[in-house]
Amino acid sequence: MLIRDVRPWGGPASDVVIEGGRISVVRPHDESVPLGAEDVEGRGRLLLPSFSDVHVHLDSTRIGLPFREHTGSPGVWGMMMNDRRNWRDTDVPHAEIVAGTLERMIARGTTRVRSYAQVDVDCKLEKFDAVMAAKERFADQAEVQIMTFPQAGILLEEGTVDYLEESLKQGADVMGGIDPSQLDRDPVKHLDIVFGLAEKYQVEIDIHLHEPGHLGVFSTELVLERVRALGMQGKVTMSHAYELGGVNEATSRRLIDEFAELDIAMASVAPAARNQLSLVDLVSSGVRFGLGEDGQRDYWSPYGNGDLLDRTWQLAFTNNFRRDEHIEMCLAIATMGGASIMSQASPRLTGVQDRPGTAVGDRADLVLVDGETPTSAVMDRGTDRTVLHDGRVVADGLRVLAH
C-alpha cells in the first residue's frame, strides 16, 4: 500500500509504503507516482501514529443513549453506587452500547485500547462480557486489552474475588486494583490479592489511585516494594495518581526516579488537578506515560466523546502548555506513549522532543488528520481523518469501514 503526500509529524511531504503491516519506505513525495486501488491519497495531511486510549471505561459508557442529568454524589463510592442504581435503565443491550462507543473511538483514530471492565457482586461478569464482545467484534479494526476491575473494592463485598478470578480465566488481559488504603482500608490484603492473581494468570497490573497526598504516596510505596521484590518491572501501571506531586519536591523526584528504575507506567485522563507529578519530568526521565478518556458520558461524568484528540487538547490545556514542543509531546503521549504501555515492543518516548511511530519498521497503526502543524491539529481537531490498523484502512471520514 502507498500513502501518498502526507507529512509525518508535520515534516516534509512524503510518500509512505506499507508492507506486511509495517512502514517499509518513507521517501520524498512524487506527484507522478500513480495511486493503485488500495492506495491512500494523503492530500497533504499530517501523518501520525494512531491514538492509544489506555484508560477508558467502555463498560460504563452511555454514548448513544439520551443525554441525562448527572446524579452522582461526590467520592468513588457515591459515584459507583450511582452507576449501580442506573446502568441497567435502558432497553438497549449493554453489549451494543459498548460496541457503539468502541466503533466511535476507532472512527476518530484510536486503534489501541485498554478498557476497564467492572467486576463485582452486582454486575458479576455482565460488563466484562459486554467489553469482550466489543473486542471480538472489532478485532480487525483495533487492539483491545481488557482489565478486570474491582470498582467497588476487593474486600468490601464477599464474592468479589471469585468473580475477578473467573474473568481472568475467561481472558482478561490486566488485573486491576483500586485505592488499597482509602477504599478497602487494608492495603496489604488488597495488594496480596492483586499481585497474587496477576502472578497466577501471568497478566499485568493497573492500580487506580485516587488517594490524596501522603496516603497516596504510602500506597504507591507499597506497590513499589512489591514490584521490586517480585521482579515485576515493566508490568505495572499507576492510573490517575494525580496527588503524588502534592507532598513535597523531594518526594516527587524520588517517585519519578523509582518509576523510571522499576519501569512503572502512568496513565492519565488529563484532570484539572494541581498536585500531579510533572509531566515534563516524567517523560524526560523515561517513564512510560499514556492518556485515556476515562468514563465517557456515563453515570460518573457527562464528559467524553470518543475522540482522543480532544483529550490531547485537554492534556495540554490542564498542564498550561503553550510551546509547540510540549503540545506535540502531548500528541506523542496520546499515540505512542499509550502504545508503549500496551506493548513493550512499541517504541518509547525518550524525551520531550521524541516523535516516534512513523519511521521505517514501525507498525502501520496510523492516522491521517488535517492540520498545518501537529500543534494546530490539536487546537483545531479536524474531522478529515483516515485511520489504519496493521497496515489496512479501517476508518475514513469518521466512519469505520466494513471488512
Give residue spans per PLM region.
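His/Asp/Glu-enriched, well-ordered alpha-helical/loop segment
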Residues: 225-236, 280-371
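N-terminal metal-binding scaffold of metallo-dependent hydrolase/deaminase domains
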Residues: 1-34, 374
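Divalent metal-coordination and catalytic microenvironments
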Residues: 6, 21, 44, 55, ...
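Active-site gating loops and adjacent loop-to-helix segments of metal-dependent hydrolytic enzymes
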Residues: 62-94, 201, 219-237, 255-258, ...
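C-terminal cap of metal-dependent C-N hydrolases
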Residues: 347-403
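Active-site core of metal-dependent hydrolases
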Residues: 148-158, 169-277, 288, 297
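Alpha-helical scaffold segments that flank or form the walls of functional sites
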Residues: 64-116, 122-137, 162-169
